[in-house]
UniProtKB/Swiss-Prot annotation:
Gene label: chsD
PANTHER family membership: CHITIN SYNTHASE (PTHR22914), CHITIN SYNTHASE 3 (PTHR22914:SF16)
Enzyme Commission (EC) number: 2.4.1.16
Name of the top EC class for this enzyme: transferase
Signal peptide start and end residues: none
Organism: Emericella nidulans (strain FGSC A4 / ATCC 38163 / CBS 112.46 / NRRL 194 / M139)
Protein name: Chitin synthase C
């Protein structure tokens, strides 16, 4: 077994040696941090949970009091980070802290700090004692080095059993008291404030008598309020932001498009259709100047009728000596230009004639000016920049005003004097269409610019306000942002499909080439019928033995690390599996003269398999649990594990490690099938599909866990009875199998559960449609949760949920890998697997999790294991799930394309970064342990204590936890893996295919998607807090998860906004182009993906069906799910006979831990052998059971 070194454990001599080579500041920091894990410290406590965090807190306080530098949370090396319970690897560190450590391959002594050792210079006698303690009495370097317990610790262990019950009761009372005085959290306070209008007595009247129900309802309203606020913000950003910052733009009329009902004065248009002019020379009383006079003024510019004089132009424009323009005592002029109108297009020539009298039509009187200023303008006249470049006019811009420099020609040189710069501007053709604001910034030039704006302004330039510009910027940034996400997801999905996915899959299987059209057609035909068996397997691919030609040049030196596996320069990388690291004599060998076909033996070719008793030499390796030297005293050579009592006579022999039928080393795989209430036909086809996979049956075994004694609706037999009929050649007759206890994932008395273990080989049935020559002999183990005797008369005895079934296997694998105390059930599981496979359980590296209603394509298992072996960083993966009942109803039709897009776009995109956020529980694979460093070093992944502990959480007291653990446990397992191992990968393997049946009734679909959507929201809330995922800032998986979370909660609002935009674009003008283009890209790119990846045009039709059903997917289902946030039932997904609506979280009574026996495997096995020798009839443990302790002492 791979046993990592204890972190944080350093010998005193190593500390003293390193101290002379390092600065004092660094030495002081390290001594402080290392003292946290020093077992000789007076603060050392047997409960590791409180030891680390509390002791480090005391150290920080002491250093602060002494005036030292307080330890900061930032810029701390990972190995010095604080190991508090919130750390992702906290439990793993606690488990490995006091584990036995093997002699490293470097030749140096392990750094083990013995308890009670004085920090003094060693003597030869002490060195010899230390060596004996480390390497054993006989100096066997292959034996593990265990800590020798002190007398004080031995006394504590002896007395711990007597006070365990009393301590447990006291701890329970203390926790209950703490819960009563626990201050409310910020979230609880917010939910209480937001639901102040619904006091508890009102909620009791509406069917919420329990406090937990009312609390869940308040949390639901709190979440809905946040969703509404996010939706309101998105709506404001979409529709209200522009109206707020830009405001309602004033009415503006474009030059040369102003009708005859208007006149223009100083760049503004006035509607004079209903106006009348008083009597004047040449103008009758009550006359409309637009139509009633001989000269029609409609559409003309009358700025010279009401000239702005004596303003900024005073001093610049003056009266000549012989001028007829009247002035006052201040020298103010009455007018500058002749009082005539001109065409708005600037085509009028200067007119200096005078009608009736001097100053006629100049409106210099106060009453005339007052009447003009009282008029309300209809809008500004605006010019575009293209209009200012018109060659027929000489237009320029100053401070947003359009100046017609041709109007300077209307000056009468005999009447007024004006600056020569006016003439220079008039005669300069280079300033046409130029903004002159910069040139008229200071001094006299600035006054000239203002003067020109008052006398020759003909309009304004077409510009937006700052608010409008800001709204446009926000619009385009949002557009670019959304388009970037959509296009990048599309491009990366294609990148994964074309270039990355083929690297993971096996190059060739029994079904032919991976990318062959024939295989794709076989998959489509196979997936159209749920009960259709897989295609007939072709002849096995010829085995491949890797070339081991030695290199002439050396590949290592004295400086090479012994932990590094050399690849020999540019040679093919050496993939590592458990079998490839162990000698072939340690496994069940094939008979002499056998061919690779023996590793796929069928039931026709049963015969005696020779078993070598010497294959499990304890001193040969340190990889396997049962081969460890610790068991040499328990299992003597005369009764080796290979005896008839341990290994089934029909066990499938193990091939040599270098046999590679598919181009990669074979890894041992468990195929976990969880059953609840499925019928015989469904379970039969599922197990047939797994047993018939082309992966060698020497490296796969089927583990079926039945979740209680359940009878499906309309079934004749219960599910366990159906499954037991599918096993042959059991090691123990089914009627003689006993039930054993284990700790279930439940509360109250249900935490104690019992199960039976059956081990044998898969039976294809008497009337199987599978040809006999194709029936492989596959090891099989069945675990039936039958419940305690107290629940024998209950409706569903033993039922604890799917998560409990998964934890049975996960906890078993953890205890096997860490050699922890196990329950009686786990001991029977260990022996059962060993009986039917001939290999110890810790040889298994991966586990395939399949639902009982899911059928696997024959070469899917091969492709999945290929990805695991080729990339040790992959810790989880999933394949594509196809729908078998596509055309059963309109409900199934709308799901076809949704399944396709979720795999080939969403999961393919996430696979590029190795962060698939959801590995579906119906068809996924997890890595049990991964190779780390050099030879025979492995680290737990799925068997990691942090994964098992958090996934087996039984205190589910908040809405968030209930949605994670009761509704979406499969997705939460993926979340836990990413949260604990953010640097490892979870990917999608499109070559691995399965099929399943989806809901064909809308109410069932509604119930299923309610669970999935709520689970998605809460799992994304967990993942968005993981900071160590791939990438940084906007280019990171964390940001992608945040966008996905926001996109999920605003789905109802988004589809509502989309429908509004489409309808408004049809019935209103102008058409909103940008939102429509964006909508077309979002909905159209998946269609391109279909054509590129699916190679079947029929999926385009499925896409159209999906688009029609978008209101259901994006509005009906999410809205229903959000309103049902506090509903934790499974609804109508699967019914059983006589089922009552009661969840797995309901628990009554008290948990009695004394009913569960927990011991290490070697202790169980020693007692068993003692009973066999003495003929005793005692319990399995051989003596009264040991109380269950959740935190064992090492």
């Amino acid at each position: 077994m791979s046993l990592p070194q204890r972190p944080g454990k350093t010998s005193p001599r190593r500390e003293e040696t390193s101290a002379f080579r390092e600065p004092s500041r660094r030495r002081r920091r390290e001594s402080d941090s290392l003292s946290n894990n020093d077992p000789t410290s007076p603060r050392h406590h047997r409960h590791h949970r409180s030891h680390s965090s509390r002791h480090q807190h005391d150290i920080d306080e002491e250093r602060a009091e002494e005036g030292g530098i307080r330890r900061k949370r930032s810029l701390v090396k990972p190995e010095r980070g604080r190991m508090d319970p919130s750390h992702p690897n906290y439990l793993y560190r606690q488990k490995t802290q006091n584990m036995p450590t093997y002699n490293p391959m470097t030749g140096n002594e392990p750094l083990i700090h013995e308890e009670g050792e004085a920090e003094t210079n060693s003597t030869p006698s002490m060195d010899s004692k230390r060596k004996d303690a480390l390497y054993g009495a006989h100096g066997n370097v292959n034996k593990p080095m265990e800590r020798v317990p002190t007398r004080h610790r031995s006394k504590k262990r002896k007395g711990s059993r007597k006070i365990s019950k009393r301590e447990a009761a006291a701890e329970k009372r203390r926790r209950k008291a703490m819960e009563q005085v626990r201050p409310p959290s910020l979230w609880t306070t917010y939910c209480s404030v937001i639901t102040f209008w619904a006091p508890d007595f009102v909620l009791k009247c509406f069917g919420m008598p329990q406090k937990a129900q009312r609390s869940a309802w308040r949390e639901k309203i709190g979440l809905i309020s946040i969703i509404l606020m996010i939706a309101a913000f998105v709506g404001f950003l979409t529709f209200g932001f522009t109206a707020t910052v830009c405001g309602t733009p004033p009415t503006r009329l474009k030059i040369n498009e102003i009708g005859s009902g208007y006149m223009i004065f100083h760049g503004q248009a006035y509607d004079l259709t209903k106006s009348t002019h008083p009597a004047a020379a040449g103008i009758p009383d009550m006359t409309n100047v637009l139509y009633d006079l001989p000269h029609k003024y409609g559409g003309q510019d009358g700025s010279f009728f009401f000239q702005e004089v004596n303003g900024a132009c005073k001093g610049l424009i003056t009266r000549t000596e012989n001028s007829d323009i009247p002035t006052n005592s201040n020298g103010d002029l009455a007018w500058y230009f002749p009082c005539h109108a001109f065409n708005q297009d600037g085509s009028s020539e200067p007119n200096t004639t005078v009608s009736y009298y001097n100053g006629w039509a100049c409106h210099t009187s106060g009453s005339a000016r007052k009447s003009f200023y009282s008029l309300k303008n209809s809008g500004d006249v605006y010019f575009t920049w293209e209009d200012t470049k018109n060659t027929s006019r000489k237009l320029a811009v100053y401070s947003g005003n359009v100046l017609d420099l041709n109007l300077l020609n209307w000056f009468d040189d005999t009447q007024v004097n004006y600056p020569t710069k006016f003439k220079d501007l008039r005669d300069n053709d280079d300033i046409r269409g130029v903004d002159l604001t910069y040139y008229f910034q200071t001094g006299e030039d600035k006054q000239i610019g203002k003067c020109l704006s008052q006398i020759i302004k003909v309009g304004s330039i077409d510009t937006d306000t700052v608010g409008c510009i800001a709204s446009q910027v926000v619009l385009y940034v949002s557009l670019i942002f959304i388009l970037s996400i959509v296009i990048v997801k599309f491009a990366f999905a294609l990148l994964f499909q074309w270039f990355l996915a083929p690297r993971f899959a096996a190059q060739k299987t029994s079904m032919g080439a991976v990318d062959s059209k024939a295989r794709n057609q076989q998959i489509e035909d196979w997936s159209n019928d749920i009960y259709r068996p897989g295609p007939r397997l072709a002849d096995p691919v010829p085995g491949d033995r890797m070339s081991k030609r030695a290199s002439f040049l050396p590949t290592t030196s004295r400086f090479s690390s012994p932990y590094t596996v050399s690849n020999g320069g540019k040679q093919k990388p050496q993939w590592v599996t458990m079998a490839s690291q162990n000698s072939t004599t340690r496994l069940v060998p094939p008979a002499s003269g056998t061919t690779p076909s023996i590793y796929r033996q069928s039931h026709n070719g049963l015969g005696n398999v020779s078993v070598d008793n010497s294959r499990l030499n304890p001193s040969a390796s340190r990889t396997s649990l049962v081969q460890d030297s610790r068991y040499s005293t328990v299992i003597p050579d005369s009764e080796g594990i290979g005896s008839a009592g341990y290994v089934h006579e029909l066990v499938v022999p193990q091939p040599p490690p270098d046999w590679q039928p598919y181009g990669f080393p074979l890894a041992h795989a468990m195929c976990l099938v969880t059953c609840y209430s499925e019928g015989e036909e469904g379970i039969r086809t599922t197990l047939d599909s797994i047993a018939l996979t082309d992966y060698p049956n020497s490296h796969k075994s089927i583990v079926v866990i039945c979740d209680g004694i359940i009878k499906g609706k309309g079934e004749e037999f219960s599910t366990p009875d159906i499954v037991l009929r599918m096993m042959r050649d059991p090691i123990i007759p089914p009627e003689e199998v006993e039930a054993f206890s284990y700790v279930a994932v439940a509360t109250g008395s249900k935490r104690h559960n019992m199960a039976k273990v059956y081990a044998g080989f898969y039976d294809y049935g008497e009337h199987s449609i599978i040809p006999v020559e194709k029936q492989q002999r596959v090891p099989m183990m069945i675990i039936v949760k039958c419940g305690t005797p107290a629940e024998a008369t209950a409706a569903k005895p033993g039922n604890r949920g799917k998560r409990d079934s998964q934890i049975i296997l996960m906890s078993f694998l953890q205890k096997v890998m860490f050699d922890e105390r196990m329950t009686e059930l786990e001991y029977e599981m260990f022996n059962g697997l060993l009986h039917v496979t001939g290999i110890p359980p810790d040889f298994y590296e991966v586990v395939l999790m399949v639902d009982a209603d899911t059928k696997v394509f024959p070469d899917s298992l091969t492709h999945m294991i290929s990805a695991m072996v080729k990339d040790p960083e992959v810790m989880g993966l999933c394949g594509e799930t196809k729908i078998a009942n596509k055309t059963d109803s309109w409900v199934t039709m709308i799901q076809v394309f949704e399944y396709f897009v979720s795999h080939h776009q969403s999961k393919a995109f996430e696979s590029v970064f190795g962060g698939v956020t959801c590995l579906p529980g119906c068809f996924s694979m997890y890595r049990i342990k991964a190779p780390k460093g050099g030879q025979n070093y492995w680290v737990p992944i799925l068997a990691n204590p942090d994964i098992v502990e958090h996934y087996s959480e039984n205190v589910v007291d908040t809405l968030h936890k209930k949605n994670l653990l009761l509704l979406g446990e499969d997705r939460y397992l993926s979340t836990l893996m990413l949260r604990t191992f953010p640097k490892r990968k979870q990917i999608f393997v499109p070559q691995a295919v399965c099929k399943t049946v989806v809901p064909d009734k809308f109410m069932v679909l509604l119930s299923q998607r309610r669970r999935w959507i709520n689970s998605t929201v809460h799992n994304l809330m967990e993942l968005v807090l993981v900071r160590d995922l791939c990438g940084t800032f906007c280019f990171s998986m964390q940001f992608v998860i945040f966008v996905e979370l926001v996109g999920t909660v605003v789905l109802p609002a988004a589809i509502s906004f989309t429908i509004y935009v489409v309808v408004s674009s049809i019935i209103k003008q102008p058409v909103q182009i940008i939102p429509l283009v964006l909508l077309a890209l979002i909905l159209g790119l998946p269609g391109v993906l279909v054509v590129v990846t699916a190679h079947r045009l029929v999926y385009v039709l499925w896409m159209l069906v999906y688009l029609i059903s978008l209101p259901i997917w994006n509005f009906v289902l999410p809205t229903y799910a959000y309103w049902k946030f506090d509903d934790f039932s499974w609804g109508d997904t699967r019914k059983t006979a006589g089922e009552k609506d009661k969840g797995h979280e309901d628990g009554e009574g008290e948990f009695d831990s004394s009913k569960i026996t927990m011991k290490r495997w070697r202790d169980f096995e020693k007692d068993r052998r003692l009973r066999m020798q003495a003929g005793w009839q005692l319990p399995v443990g051989g003596h009264p059971p040991m109380p269950y302790e959740p935190y064992p002492e090492y």
